[in-house]
Amino acid sequence: TTGKDIYREELVGGQSARLLCGYIYASAGDGESTQDVVYSAHNIIAENGRILKKAKRFANETVYSEIDVLRLNAERRRMTTFETRMDGYTEIPFALKIEETELTRYIDPMPFVPGSKTDRERRCDEILSIQAMGLKKRLEHTHCRSAVIGISGGLDSTLALLVTVRAFDLLGMDHKNIKAVTMPGFGTTDRTYDNAVSLIKCLNADFMEVSIRDAVNIHFRDIGQDPKVHDVTYENGQARERTQILMDIANKTGGMVIGTGDLSELALGWATYNGDHMSMYAVNASVPKTLVRHLVRYYADTCGDKELEAVLLDVLDTPVSPELLPPEDGKISQKTEDLVGPYELHDFYLYHMLRLGYAPAKIYRLAKIAFAGTYEDETILKWLKTFYRRFFAQQFKRSCLPDGPKVGSVAVSPRGDLRMPSDACVKLWREQLDRL
């Protein structure tokens, strides 16, 4: 009957979601009796609420796809509905030759980002609301009179400031109680500095500027660090000086330091321990870098302020960098993705490892399909090895994270989402990677 196909797809998809299973539906077709009804040969393959393949009705098509059993197992482990039952079945040994077949299903290279514009905009608005509501509650609970946030002109601090502004609007508080601090250092470029200043002024926050150069040079002198040696001490000394400044301003103004670091940075440990790693409430802690871009873009598209939109678009166009090393010819010399790898790859690895529990070999296979034509296989494997090495080695930073709102199904909070020992060994994962 007319309209039955839509209902059938919803029914099959819904049932596969309810049971966390694969569902294969095969309808009768050409050749069946048409005395009272006509069969449409509507064939459907669904997995956990998602229609993988469906046949065109009345075409007698054969459809095929792959059902990811490991994914279904991972989903069922997360649900208390499905108990572990070790009895009640019989094992029957048999021989089966296992061959690797070509995967035909779509592998999303951006698992954190909805594909359709409508879904993406709805998700962005929801995430901004979750972040803002989380901060609103924390400000109310602590009776803080201000929020203190370091603004670098980069993506993460920009998003954190936008969230803070939304939280203040919910509270009916003056934006001047947002102490937005720019702290120029040895690696600050004119582009990021100008964007930071413009952003703060567009949002009517209280602009503050505290240069860290003199304080860091004095600190280097005190500890015997040669400022011409651009090592980890040179970089981390700047990050910790900035955090000290923000903490002290917060104490002085009865405020709270708002953390800016995102989920991708936390996964890689790309943060200075007790530097930008530390805050009083970390609003971006469960937002991956690939999603941060879309959140800032969504704000730019919907803010209704041309000047603010222009600033946000230039922030989006700026290379991701901690700006801890001196610039070259006035431009950013230290680009994060050149050092640790593309964030779109790392977010893909992170999602499939934490959300679905996949092993390195499977993640590598899926990544080769998802990023075919974008990255060479050798590049994908190189950064996958980097991801595992850093993820395990940097757990000690995640073991003492500040509070922050969870916005999605993947998070690394040590208080519930990732109860992982800081001295966990990566050996088993590296051995599998070395065999690829």
PLM regions and their residue ranges:
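ATP/NTP-dependent adenylation/nucleotidyl-transfer catalytic domains that generate, transfer
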Residues: 3, 17-21, 30-34, 41, ...
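Charged helix-capping and loop-helix junction motifs
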Residues: 6-13
